[in-house]
Amino acid sequence: MRSPIPLSLLWGLMVLALATNMGSLAVLLALGYHCLLRPGEMCRLERRHVRLPGNVGWHSSVGMVVITDPKTARTAARVQHVVIHDRLVLLLCQAFWGRLLPHQPLSPGNIRGLEGWFRWAMVSLGLKERQFTPAGLRAGGATHDYLAGSPVERLMWRGRWAALSTLKHYVQECASVLATATMPPVAQYRLTVFEGFLTSFLSALTGSWQ
């Protein structure tokens, strides 16, 4: 079972990445959460795989992630996509990735590097080293959308699950884990402080792009 990452923890992870001069990773974490990406899919992304409003040939107010080597390629489409609806995620993508060349990678490393960074981040936040893993971004994003009222059928499309029955079981378990999860007081305090940092950063970023 992949422990779903709650939104407050996502924010904490993003602040850690920003504070260590890894802005691209902070955006990648937000994108993985919002678009229900698998860790391997995140690490293989290049700039050409993310379409953003204002890009040449792209005439839409939303963005899109194109996944060229999906896990479910044998039973579904060989090239898949997820639409980026979230305004702040789009803003972050524009700010950090807008001027990258088409074949520039969006991840600072491979999946092992991402897993290692997660272990460091967990300890830095006052959690157990392996309490949450990169796979928890997909689980957390799906659970967050489900609790916000997103129909299971929509989640299946966005998350590209092969079977509806599998997704229903997955979301049911994730929601239960998230509801019963408790974090030590030190982690809760740090996440509260980091939330304030991220709110200020996003407010400043939003103002600069208006």
How would you label these PLM feature ranges?
Residues 1-210:
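Extended, non-catalytic subsegments within catalytic or DNA/protein-binding/adaptor domains
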